[in-house]
Amino acid sequence: MSQASSSPGEGPSSEAAAISEAEAASGSFGRLHCQVLRLITNVEGGSLEAGRLRLLDLRTNIEVSRPSVLCCFQENKSPHDTVDLTDLNIKGRCVVGEQDRLLVDLNNFGPRRLTPGSENNTVSVLAFALPLDRVPVSGLHLFQSQRRGGEENRPRMEARAIIRRTAHHWAVRLTVTPNWRRRTDSSLEAGQIFVSQFAFRAGAIPLTLVDALEQLACSDPNTYIHKTETDERGQWIMLFLHHDSPHPPTSVFLHFSVYTHRAEVVARHNPYPHLRRLPDNGFQLLIPKSFTLTRIHPEYIVQIQNAFETNQTHDTIFFPENIPGVSIEAGPLPDRVRITLRVTLTGDQAVHLEHRQPLGRIHFFRRGFWTLTPGKPDKIKRPQVQLRAGLFPRSNVMRGAVSEFLPQSPGLPPTEEEEEEEEEDDEDDLSSTPTPTPLSEAMFAGFEEASGDEDSDTQAGLSPALILTGQRRRSGNNGALTLVIPSWHVFASLDDLVPLTVSVQHAALRPTSYLRSDMDGDVRTAADISSTLRSVPAPRPSPISTASTSSTPRSRPRI
């Protein structure tokens, strides 16, 4: 793109030429179509002290034609770059929807103040969209227990149930007098939970065919079914109840249905109350206990006493909310491992997060969308401030040339394998099998056969221009670019991403701004774009602490 130049001796004609050139540039940047957007921007519109945080407005909007996860990560320009914190560090942004304005946290971890005219004030980000296909999930799965000692170990408490067959499920109504036991749990707001368990005869319900249960009604609003199991002989259904108020009821009426679901993903326990089901794919994660992040206590670990099991058919990914001044772990969640997320303060002021405040979303991606990077032991999650993305040739990725994460400090949290879930229900000594036969065998084969149809459905409703952008197959071409997320040890094909429609605001353009196209238009680069700094909005007031008034710059957070 030609650059506009002027000299003191030139008259109004040169100014008119510059204006017309700016208008032409605005038109070319107004509506771009691509799979991945690379945005190279110069930080302007204010200064940023060393060790401080401000919001960076990239003045760019992205849109997609279907609900997706819209991501904006700092770019790794070389396969040898680590995901350590940089002097100018951008926190990864993830938004679920169909459009987003790119507004990210910018931390100055360098030793010097950043001003508009200073050197090294250029940052580069990659924006892309991840598809959200419909994934059925069983909230209350009927696990088959393996009891020690046989029938005599069945729970002593029994309940009489009224069972009726309907068109598509078995309706069960029963009244039980629970034998409540109090159990302490520091991860909950109340610090305790009341638990009870009982069993009822399945009667005519074919326990070898049904695999799911749905609670329809309960006489007490604070009581819910936490877990369900069947015995080895297929004669009993066991229910584990939880009550989260200080005064549990003496009698509980339950109405629920038992049916055959054969879902591709199951939850180990009832998602309620800290996982809110989303319509087609995933759950919204709610904070189980309020907490405050301060400069004295900058970290907190959120624990959800639940896990998911996919039988290797899906990857479970957690995408955190965009809370200014807070970095939350994001990335893959391993199967059958309790959900633990480290939350870290990265800003200057204390931040208070309320009980049941949304912390992020959990979504599921079909097997094969994410590929483990060669040479890496497993997929991992990392804090938002360490989310990086890169575009590298497939040959380099398959050769294992992408650098591994280098720890910033020796005090790292334990790995997920060390936190393998130990069935936290102390009320029983049961061990559950992963899944019944209908899910582990019949459903897996059906999923494999339907994968081709799901790929074709992802193009439905797209404009011809967007379809052409995403249909250029590059299989077998080792020089083709792939999207690598080194923070998670994964990479993905550009063809599997949702096409983007990008518009850069006219105010962000400079006379030297230019566009570049790679991979037949699948990758568009908008370079020399102007971005502005904004103040961080005041955090939610904390009931136990106030905003820090110290003038000491904040050091790099321990991650």
Swiss-Prot record:
Residue ranges, annotated region (Disordered): 404-440, 530-559
UniProt KW Phosphoprotein keyword: yes
The UniProt record lists the keyword Phosphoprotein: yes
Phenotypic consequence of C218S: Increased inhibition of STING1-mediated antiviral response
Modified residues (Phosphothreonine): T223
GO CC, any one term: host cell nucleus
Modification note: S-nitrosylation limits ability to undermine the cGAS/STING antiviral pathway.
Sorted UniProt keywords: Activator, G1/S host cell cycle checkpoint dysregulation by virus, Host endoplasmic reticulum, Host nucleus, Host-virus interaction, Inhibition of host innate immune response by virus, Modulation of host cell cycle by virus, Phosphoprotein, S-nitrosylation, Viral immunoevasion, Virion, Virion tegument
Subcellular location: Virion tegument; Host nucleus; Host endoplasmic reticulum
An individual GO BP term: symbiont-mediated perturbation of host cell cycle G1/S transition checkpoint
Sequence ranges of Low complexity compositional bias: 431-440, 543-559
Start-end of Acidic residues biased regions: 415-430
InterPro entries, A to Z: Herpes_UL82/UL83
Modified residues (S-nitrosocysteine): C218
Subunit structure: Interacts with the host protein DAXX; this interaction takes place at ND10 and induces the reversal of DAXX-mediated repression of viral transcription. Interacts with UL35. Interacts with host TMEM173/STING1; this interaction inhibits the cGAS/STING pathway. Interacts with host RB1; this interaction mediates RB1 proteasomal degradation.
Record-stated family: Belongs to the herpesviridae pp71 family.
Biological role stated in the UniProt entry: Stimulates viral immediate-early (IE) transcription. Plays a role in the inhibition of the host innate repsonse by targeting STING1 and thus the cGAS-STING pathway. Also counteracts host DAXX-mediated repression of viral transcription. Displaces a DAXX-binding protein, ATRX, from nuclear domain 10 sites (ND10) shortly after infection. Increases the basal level of SUMOylated DAXX in infected cells. Stimulates quiescent cells to re-enter the cell cycle, proceed through G1 and enter the S phase.
Protein name per its UniProtKB record: Protein pp71
Encoding gene per record: UL82
